[in-house]
Curated annotation (Swiss-Prot):
Record-given protein name: Large ribosomal subunit protein eL39
UniProt entry tagged with the keyword Ribonucleoprotein: yes
Gene Ontology cellular component annotations, sorted alphabetically: ribonucleoprotein complex; ribosome
InterPro entries: Ribosomal_eL39, Ribosomal_eL39_CS, Ribosomal_eL39_dom_sf
Highest taxon, organism lineage: Archaea
Stated family: Belongs to the eukaryotic ribosomal protein eL39 family.
Biological process according to GO: translation
Key words of the record: Ribonucleoprotein, Ribosomal protein
């Protein structure tokens, strides 16, 4: 990908990067491990973004 990105695309990629994380530990503890992983996790090679 090009180094020089439009600002809108850069912001969308940053938002996707931030949302691609596990839930916090306190959520797992509070729900007694009922919630252990995020349904919206994305692997960089398997699923591509439409950004």
């Amino acid at each position: 990908m090009a180094r020089n990105k439009p600002l809108g695309k850069k912001l969308r990629l940053a938002a996707a990067l931030k949302s691609n994380r596990n839930p916090p530990v306190w959520v797992v503890v509070k729900t007694k491990r009922r919630v252990t992983r995020s349904p919206t996790r994305r692997h960089w090679r398997r699923t591509k973004l439409k950004a």
